[in-house]
């Protein structure tokens, strides 16, 4: 019965998911770490709550930080948590990352899997309960945060100012069941040795918690550079260019395989290939 209901609702679910995936909700963290976390995160939260209202569900906006869509009126509650903020968009997308498309049964858009689809999934759990008039001894709440990708300051703020559910569930994509998360370090590394003057730039294209799949270096022309280029790896492409002052340079682009920072062995680091 549930499978048939989901199949029937799928076209509308895709429309709802498309509505929020069109919003470029990259979180912006103010110095005091307090909400809101940028105008686009405010907008996507308002849009998600509006969808909940359209289905006749109770909604609440907690200071443009966290949103809640509720089914039931029990004194105690179970929370289903997701987040609507996304990591910044890099290059090399085949589609506009904020104009969702469906190909071979998959929706392609920035933030679709991480984590807007979980928000819409939780909404449809509540909608199923409502349409089937299922009575629960507690409230079932879908919570949506807006700064998970940049430090989870939304949760810090919510816990400090509002009452939390008695039980919280976090259906974060395909990760295994767990009760915690790995630690992380965000910082800057500085080399003691000076960098060659022939190196104009070195960069990679990836999110904060991802193995980079693209890395680029621009170097001034030199005999040894030509020698290195001639013996380059097949995964490195080379393009001749000119600097602003008209001197010849080379742009080296390495292609790796992206992966989540929690499982780096699943990828191939483009920076490592380039170096």
Describe each region flagged by the PLM.
Residues 1-90:
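N-terminal helical capping/dimerization or prosegment-like subdomains
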Residues 65-67, 74, 146-150, 257:
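Short, internal active-site loops enriched in acidic
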Residues 149, 155-157, 161-275:
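Midchain, well-structured core segments that form catalytic/ion-binding scaffolds
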Residues 67, 106-107, 248-250:
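Hydrophobic residues embedded in beta-strands of well-ordered beta-sheets
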Residues 60-63, 109, 142, 169-171, ...:
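General beta-strand structural signal in soluble alpha/beta enzymes
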Residues 77-144, 150, 161-163:
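Active-site metal-coordination/substrate-binding segment of hydrolases
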Residues 59, 100-102, 238-240:
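A structural signal for short hydrophobic beta-strand segments in well-ordered beta-sheet cores
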